[in-house]
């Protein structure tokens, strides 16, 4: 491999790294939403998978049936985290796609966790 070719590969690697960092910051600012109980519980998560908001409709709050509320919150939280993970993978794949070369591993697998 010539020095010129190696230099070009290094420039490409630096460009990829910069694009990945930029996209990671963008993804962290994105949000997804999930609901359960027909919209009685709504959870929002950011692209990093952090829960940023939980809203519970008053009608679902029953002191005699806390277990149902817990189940609804758990279901909505799990779905929000799943959607945040899917969002992050989808967005990061957009960055890695142009740089996937024949014979090179798929880079999108590196972005499962932000």
Curated annotation (Swiss-Prot):
Pfam families, per this entry?
A: YbaB_DNA_bd (PF02575)
Q: What Gene3D superfamilies is this protein classified in?
A: Nucleoid-associated protein YbaB-like domain
Query: Could you name the Gene Ontology cellular component terms for this entry?
Result: bacterial nucleoid; cytosol
Statement: the UniProt record of this protein carries the keyword DNA-binding: yes
Mainly resides where?
cytoplasm
Localization in the cell: Cytoplasm, Nucleoid
Keywords, comma-separated and alphabetical: Cytoplasm, DNA-binding
InterPro entries registered for this protein in UniProt: YbaB-like_sf, YbaB/EbfC
Classification via SUPFAM superfamilies = YbaB-like
Q: GO molecular function terms here?
A: DNA binding
* HAMAP family in the cross-refs: DNA_YbaB_EbfC
* Assembly behavior: Homodimer.
Could you tell me what this protein does?
Binds to DNA and alters its conformation. May be involved in regulation of gene expression, nucleoid organization and DNA protection.
Q: Which family does the record assign?
A: Belongs to the YbaB/EbfC family.
Q: What is this protein called?
A: Nucleoid-associated protein THEYE_A1069
* Phylogenetic lineage: Bacteria, Pseudomonadati, Nitrospirota, Thermodesulfovibrionia, Thermodesulfovibrionales
